[in-house]
From Swiss-Prot:
Contains two disulfide bonds; only the oxidized protein, with two disulfide bonds, is active in complex formation. The C-terminal disulfide is involved in the interaction with GAPDH and the N-terminal disulfide mediates the binding of PRK with this binary complex. Induction: Induced by light. Repressed by darkness, cold, anaerobic treatment, heat and sucrose. Changes conformation depending on redox conditions. PANTHER family: CALVIN CYCLE PROTEIN CP12-2, CHLOROPLASTIC. InterPro entries: CP12-like (IPR039314), CP12_dom (IPR003823). It comes from Arabidopsis thaliana. Monomer. Component of a complex that contains two dimers of PRK, two tetramers of GAPDH and CP12. CP12 associates with GAPDH, causing its conformation to change. This GAPDH/CP12 complex binds PRK to form a half-complex (one unit). This unit probably dimerizes due partially to interactions between the enzymes of each unit. Belongs to the CP12 family. Mostly expressed in cotyledons, leaves and flower stalks, and, to a lower extent, in flowers and stems. Barely detectable in roots and siliques. Residues 105-131 have a biased composition (Basic and acidic residues). This is Calvin cycle protein CP12-2, chloroplastic. It comes from the Eukaryota. Disulfide bonds join 75-84, 117-126.
Amino acid sequence: MATIATGLNIATQRVFVTSENRPVCLAGPVHLNNSWNLGSRTTNRMMKLQPIKAAPEGGISDVVEKSIKEAQETCAGDPVSGECVAAWDEVEELSAAASHARDKKKADGSDPLEEYCKDNPETNECRTYDN
């Protein structure tokens, strides 16, 4: 499991196979930087997750907030479980969908002249000429 984000580490296995095909145990426990478990401790340098506030109509931000709460509840007991990883993957996908929806909304209505010309194609400002 590898994640590219600020504050996350790559998880490694505690046992690996050498060229002699016998397992070798790593010394000591593997500690992960659990940045998703922010509610149980104070953080000075870690990024905190905030719900998305500015989202288009359709309730995407509500779904993202709900999935963040569910992911936090899922990860409360075992933050390195597969269920926890899947819950945060869902949050990431929903956040990306909300971001794409906001970008699309900005692109659709970004030019006021185009909106004006859709309503008034006969005006001088909106005429197009072919040579």
